[in-house]
Amino acid sequence: MGSEMWYKRQTLDSANTIADGTAVKRVGDRIFEYAKKNIDQMLTVEDDELVGAFLDMVENHKMIVENSGLLTVAALKQLDLKGKKAVAILSGGNMDVITMSSIVQHGLIQRDRIFSASVLLPDKPGQLALVAQTIADAQGNVIKLEHNQFVSTNRNAAVELRITMEAYGTEHKNQIMKALEEKGFRPREIGAKLY
């Protein structure tokens, strides 16, 4: 935000964010005056950036920090700090297990480490095994399969297979999709859902 924002308090219509510990529609009088005097720059952070920061902290630092406490980490990623020293203040670990699980899953999906694809298969023996082997040969890992025989009015013509898989990232995901394509499965990426 520009410096002009410091001189007028804003009131938001809503404060809907996963950083619920800092979600306010209007900053308090004392905090606003303190911030105006002491803060040089203000950055905004999207929920997707917080999800990425949470996943980084869990995977790389083995720390659980609540979303509001990760605002500094997510904001620092927006700045060019290469070769500079910076300190991010981390606070809070007040997060329930369901929320943690949801954030980790969203982070893995964001980074293409979990993705889903749909393929149409001839309804004949061995097709499911061939798909599974193709994914395994590409070093992918199947998490979930949904086999739908009723996608076509002529179920003997084709069945739909929805596959949720693990990959190492975008490049690996693309390799798995290419391997399926090369076997003639014509995969189509669909939104990943783990539940």
Question: What would you call each of these model-derived segments?
Answer:
Residues 1, 8-37, 77-122, 132:
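Glycine-rich phosphate/pyrophosphate-binding loop at beta-loop-alpha junctions
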Residues 2, 30, 53, 130, ...:
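Short Gly/charged-rich anion-binding patches and loops
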Residues 18, 38, 59, 67, ...:
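A generic structural signal for well-ordered coil/turn residues at beta-strand boundaries
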Residues 18, 22, 26, 46-50, ...:
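Glycine-rich beta-alpha junction loops
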Residues 26, 58-61, 80, 94, ...:
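Alpha-helix capping/termination and helix-coil
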Residues 28-84:
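Active-site-adjacent helical/loop segments in soluble small-molecule enzymes
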Residues 97-195:
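A conserved regulatory-domain signal marking ACT and ACT-like small-molecule sensing domains
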